[in-house]
Each structure stands twice: as structure tokens, then as C-alpha cells.
């Protein structure tokens, strides 16, 4: 499939759904050729010894995290909400633990497709995710020990600098990642930053894919030739205050590539910006 897409210059993304034991035997290759991974625990649980399923889930998450690709945990997350307005305690813990393990996204299926309480299911999952992300149990501003080093060290150096800066800048309200491909945004996401990442991108398809990554909200912009100058910073200040609720005196971290911040070149720039 990857060869066919490449041959036709397609930018479609491949999210591989892991549901067979045979996939586990080739999981490293599958992750390499995929843009993201879904742990489909329903079918996987049928063909895998039930006591092994939590180990399999954690292993897939760690391997996918290590190469900075999004990983989705799905199936029977809040299964009881197909019939009931509240989940079981075990289900709430299951969702939380998937996020602690490193899942970028958790996914509902039958709860919203055929359940009696679809809106409530989404609302409760959102609350669980937000609370666990803000808890002391989450890794914050730290990269996992398993993360692979980069052949292109500059974007990784920027991402590490962002993580280190956030540790020492308690007033920071967000990371503004100006990107053409989302590459550095994905790197920064893997450190599980203590603040939201706002991924500014001209390409709507890239922006939608970035939404899968932990802590990332994508914002579409119309001009990829943005430069760091006085007028651009004034516009950014107004946007951050009006659209994102930030205030004068708040700080954000800006990343991009100079001279044009979203030119498609590797990220080579980081700036601490105080909103005025």
C-alpha cells in the first residue's frame, strides 16, 4: 500500500489497525510503514490470550511512541455507556491508563455509533482525558527513554529546547508551532508538554492529521510566507488574546524555520514571545 501511494505521489495517511496475532509478529515493520497505529482491542482480544492483552497494548504504544507516530487505543473503552448514562469505574480507569501509557488518542465506537448516550460518552471521555493529562501521573516536558535519535538533529534539538524551556518558564501558555509538514509539531508532542501546542499550518490535510497527536490543536492559516516582523507579531498578539484567551504579559514559545516560518524547510528557530 505504501508503495502504491508513493508511486502516485499520494499524501493519504495510513493508520494500521492492529487486530491479528500475525500483525504482532511484524509490528516493527508495520509501524515503520504506517503513519499511525490503532490498537483494536476487540478483535485483538479474541485472538490473543486475554491476560496478554494489556501487555500487548503497552508494547505497541511504546514502540509507536519511540518513532513519534500517533497511536490510538480503541474498542470497549466505555462499553457500558451503550446502555447506561455513566461508565463503570473500571472503564474510566482503562481510558486513563491508556493515556498514561502514552496513547495519543482514545476512540469510541459502539458507544457513539449505536449507543443510547453518545453525547454523554464523548463528554465523559473528554473529562477523563483532560484530568489525567493534568495529573501528576503524566510525564511532562520529558521525552521517553525509548525515543529514537534523529538523523536531522536540528528539529530534535528545537523540540528538546522547547521541553527544557517549559520546565523553567511557568508563565508559558502554549507552544506556537508554525509548520508546513507537522514534523516538528510531532516531535514536540512526544515530550508531553505541560501546555497546549497550537500547530499553525496552511495545509488543511496536515492540520487534520496533527490533531491526532497528544496536546495538539491545529489552526489553519492562509499565508505560508509568514515572517517574524513587527506587523506579524502584532497580528499574533491579537489572535492569541481574542481566539485563545491569552492575556498581555503571557508568554508563548514560537517555533518555525527562517526566513519564512512555514516554508517547508526544517525547523531551525525558537523564540520566547511575551504577549503585548
Question: Language-model segments: what does each one mean?
Answer:
Residues 1-276:
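Non-catalytic helical/linker scaffolds that mediate oligomerization, partner binding
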